[in-house]
């Protein structure tokens, strides 16, 4: 039985359920050295309930996890693998492990997540133990690098600290340019303000480090990108390098409407936990964005593909006069696909932009998301092209039209397969031929102000 009521009331239906694989991702920064029991979590979505089977080095570990629970390490509800790093180190010594996760929805195709590398380091034997101090104002590049005799540059400090060491920064400004160290580093090297140093007295300036696995903690990053200029604060090496940013801040000193500035560029594999991006044209494009705030950006506040965005917030997205602005963009042209995106637990407010522009996406979930508009006149969101295995669950977007693309020649038309919108609150939803699941699009248990067929 089915009932459709328009103009602001409930749409309820008994409809087909997903026939597609679960949508899931690790909520873990890889290559960590861990001890004790490390809670490695998976975030997963499907129209049906899911469960997760975990492996360590290819062997099944523990019981199948039937439901998510709060991971105290991340603050996120996850399917958790309690990785016994300490116990394994006691038995086998410190070493590398490969974690696996198989996400299963009853009667559907399971999904094997990409393998995750971690290091059991219960005995503390892995990686460099060296701590190097740097002082850009009073240091000496040929000094010993200890507290009383710091080096001058970040490049020298990173080299001396070694693979997995620690760099302490005293007050001053430090460049990311040409830090060196190559692409074969195995462990995260920590870079952080020295004990007792106010983070606001340490300034990290834009550059291309040219090395791998730098872990920045409690630092402020800046670029100086003026009108007509293009730049990134932290540049990658075409996908060969990764960086982890814990409680770090990113900004363009000239403001969001100046140059075309990005927090990350050239395919840096970025992992962002905590911190804030503000007064810069673009938000951070990261593989993992957890607990991060994005404020006062011009456009593209969040990643559009190949990312887990969880428990983040966005406030004040507005382009310069005459320019366009979109919160989330995920677009591909055949034969390529965009997507592989999870956005969960997002609160976005102060939006004067299109909320999303999606074309030819698959394997995406938008769950427990609220969008609050500051201004929306003449603006709309759209979904176009082939759209496969996409779930909108408990999404609130009132006051902006969502266009499911339709054209006279059929090019770029919305062609859904296993697309579900449930428990959502929308404004105008236009362009849908059928919403009962019979044509690949299932809208249920939702409130829609106006629906145009």
Q: In which residue ranges do the predicted regions lie?
A:
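All-beta strand scaffolds that present successive hydrophobic residues in beta-strands
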Residues: 190-191, 215-218, 243-245, 263, ...
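Short, compositionally biased P/S/T/A/G/V-rich stretches that sit at domain boundaries
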Residues: 19-40
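Aromatic sugar-binding surface patches on proteins
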Residues: 70-87
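Short, T/G/N/S-enriched strand-turn elements that build extracellular solenoid repeat scaffolds
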Residues: 154-161, 174-184, 201-210, 233-235, ...
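Surface-exposed, short loops/turns at beta-strand junctions within beta-sandwich domains
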Residues: 86-96
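Right-handed parallel beta-helix/beta-spiral solenoid domain characteristic of secreted/periplasmic
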Residues: 184-238, 244-255, 316-319, 344, ...
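Residues in short coils/turns that link rungs of repeat/solenoid architectures in beta-rich domains
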Residues: 223, 252, 257, 270, ...
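Right-handed parallel beta-helix/beta-solenoid
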Residues: 116-156, 173, 194
């Amino acid at each position: 039985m089915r009932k459709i009521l328009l103009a602001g009331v409930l749409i309820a239906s008994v409809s087909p359920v997903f026939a597609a694989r679960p949508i899931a991702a690790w909520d873990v920064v890889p290559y960590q050295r861990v001890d004790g029991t490390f809670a490695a979590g998976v975030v997963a979505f499907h129209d049906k309930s899911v469960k997760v089977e975990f492996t360590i080095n290819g062997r099944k570990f523990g019981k199948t996890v039937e439901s998510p629970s709060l991971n105290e390490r991340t603050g996120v509800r996850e399917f958790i693998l309690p990785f016994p790093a300490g116990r394994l180190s006691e038995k086998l010594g410190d070493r590398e492990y490969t974690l696996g996760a198989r996400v299963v929805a009853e009667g559907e195709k399971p999904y094997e997540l990409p393998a995750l590398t971690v290091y059991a380091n219960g005995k503390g034997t892995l990686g460099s133990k060296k701590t190097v101090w740097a002082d850009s104002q009073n240091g000496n590049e040929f000094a010993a690098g200890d507290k009383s005799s710091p080096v001058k540059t970040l490049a020298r400090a990173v080299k001396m600290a070694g693979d997995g060491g620690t760099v302490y920064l005293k007050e001053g400004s430090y460049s990311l340019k040409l830090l060196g160290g190559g692409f074969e580093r195995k462990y995260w090297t920590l870079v952080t303000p020295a004990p007792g140093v106010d983070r606001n007295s340490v300034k990290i300036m834009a550059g291309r480090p040219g090395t791998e696995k730098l872990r920045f903690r409690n630092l402020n990053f800046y670029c100086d990108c003026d009108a007509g200029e293009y730049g990134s604060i932290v540049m990658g090496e075409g996908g060969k390098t990764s960086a982890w940013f814990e409680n770090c801040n990113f900004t363009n000193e000239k403001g969001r409407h100046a140059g075309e500035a990005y927090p990350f560029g050239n395919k840096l594999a970025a992992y962002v936990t905590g911190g804030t991006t503000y007064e810069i044209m673009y938000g951070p494009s990261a593989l993992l964005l957890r607990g991060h705030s994005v404020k006062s950006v011009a456009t593209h506040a969040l990643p559009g593909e190949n990312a887990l965005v969880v428990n983040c917030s966005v406030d004040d997205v507005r382009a310069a006069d005459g320019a366009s602005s979109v919160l989330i963009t995920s677009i591909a042209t055949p034969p390529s696909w965009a997507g592989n995106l999870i956005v969960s637990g997002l609160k976005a407010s102060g939006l004067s932009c299109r909320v999303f522009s999606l074309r030819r996406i698959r394997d995406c979930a938008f769950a427990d998301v609220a969008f609050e508009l500051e201004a929306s006149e003449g603006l709309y969101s759209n979904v176009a092209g082939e759209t496969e295995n996409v779930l909108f669950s408990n999404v609130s977007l009132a006051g902006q039209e969502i266009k499911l693309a339709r054209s006279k020649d059929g090019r770029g038309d919305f062609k859904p397969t296993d697309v579900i919108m449930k428990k959502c609150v929308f404004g105008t939803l236009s362009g849908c031929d059928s919403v009962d699941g019979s044509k690949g699009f299932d809208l249920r248990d939702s409130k829609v102000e106006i629906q145009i067929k």
